[in-house]
Amino acid sequence: MNNLERLRQENPLVVCYTNDVVKNFTANGLLSIGASPAMSEAPEEAKEFYKVAGALLINIGTMTKANEQDILEIGKIANQQGTPIVFDPVAVGASSYRKAFCQKFLSEVKVSVIKGNASEILTLVDATTTMKGTDGKTDLDVVEIAKRAHEELNTAIVLTGKDDVVVQGGKVVKLSNGSPLLAKITGAGCLLGGIVASFLFREENPTLQVLEEAVSIYNIAAEIAEKDQQVNGPGTFLPKLLDQMYNIDFNTYQQQVKRQEVE
């Protein structure tokens, strides 16, 4: 049984502490791929949820001072329960507040995967980096950024961009599927964090293969959706993306994946 079939058979619970802008889209995307989302944020119920969850997604997109302690607490509870965490440091380079919080969080909580764009990932290992909102750009080598973050933060890295770079266990793969329309709908990257979480199956040290499958299956679904004759922009693309996430099978992934192993 491949990982996509396993996901659809097991219907893993993915607990999402995510930002207010993307909750609905994230939940619908996870349902479409075959997971079971729970948008639970209360530390008071975390222990019970995490006992049965396949993974926890923590996305700081709309965090405030009021929920800092909640995020730290649920991260620590997940660690205690052996529940893997996917951490999405949204716009971490946009403010010193976000940088300081992410540094504190990563010093106190062990995460299994960090997902972000090149600027976000670089900011985690280089405090001098700045970015504009969530869409930071950098001219630096994305492979080197991902490798450096993997080594310094001791966790798997999913770096997103024109090409996605996944680093785990000292191995690097560059993935080249996707659609430019993903950048035209809010929450596409945030949903990817949830998709990665849905493939973890309570494994705190996921394999490179699992991570690249999660990323590429999502991006191939986006490619297929973009080509649909009824799609003429972001508004018609979004529902077709959900449809293709629901319909995609592992054979399609194997036939269409664009991957390159990198030294």
From Swiss-Prot:
Residue sites binding substrate per the record: 39, 187
EC main group: transferase
Pathway in which the depicted protein is active: Cofactor biosynthesis; thiamine diphosphate biosynthesis; 4-methyl-5-(2-phosphoethyl)-thiazole from 5-(2-hydroxyethyl)-4-methylthiazole: step 1/1
Record EC number: 2.7.1.50
Family: Belongs to the Thz kinase family.
Any GO MF annotation of the entry: magnesium ion binding
Residues annotated as binding ATP: 115, 160
Catalytic activity reported: 5-(2-hydroxyethyl)-4-methylthiazole + ATP = 4-methyl-5-(2-phosphooxyethyl)-thiazole + ADP + H(+)
GO biological process, alphabetically ordered: thiamine biosynthetic process; thiamine diphosphate biosynthetic process
One Pfam family named in its UniProt record: HK
SUPFAM superfamilies named among the record's database cross-references: Ribokinase-like
Cofactor dependence: Mg(2+)
Keywords: ATP-binding, Kinase, Magnesium, Metal-binding, Nucleotide-binding, Thiamine biosynthesis, Transferase
Gene from which the chain derives: thiM
Function of the molecule: Catalyzes the phosphorylation of the hydroxyl group of 4-methyl-5-beta-hydroxyethylthiazole (THZ).
UniProt protein name: Hydroxyethylthiazole kinase
Top-rank taxon, per record: Bacteria
